[in-house]
Amino acid sequence: TTKYEHVIPQLVAVQEDPAIEGLLVLLNTVGGDVEAGLALAELIASISKPSAAVVLGGGHSIGIPLAVSAQRSFIVPTATMTVHPVRHSGMILGVPQTMRWFEQMQERITGFVASHSGISEKRYTELMMRTGELVMDVGTVLDGRKAVREKLIDELGGLSDALAWLYREIEGK
């Protein structure tokens, strides 16, 4: 599914349940619903308990804000993340207001990613608007090492690395 709303009550439960000491988010997504994904990312970012995210296979499109929403992000070397402009399937009105809506949505995503990772808005936009890498499209595909090098993701690592970080954070509280 590309809908994520069913996860919202589960995240609220993580925050509210005193028996839960931390949050681990495992990501393997091609992306999907931009509004729902950004809402989830904002919710994860606002959880006061230690949180870590691991990109395992794909962290494409709206998966990027989800990956960087945790306090610490990890990515396995073979995972990929596709940075591209907001897209829409189906019919749209070809009017200036529609273009402005797309621009505003992209600004929201870019701002969120830049404020929750080490990448600048300028660099993220450069990667998003790059031509020549994707066939008949704009954007950039980053593997795990490149995502860390671009400061989009905090560190290269998998499940055990994320769990070790979470346990250290929980013990430190």
PLM segments and residue spans:
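N-terminal organellar transit peptides
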Residues: T1-V54, G58-I64, V68-H84, H88-K173
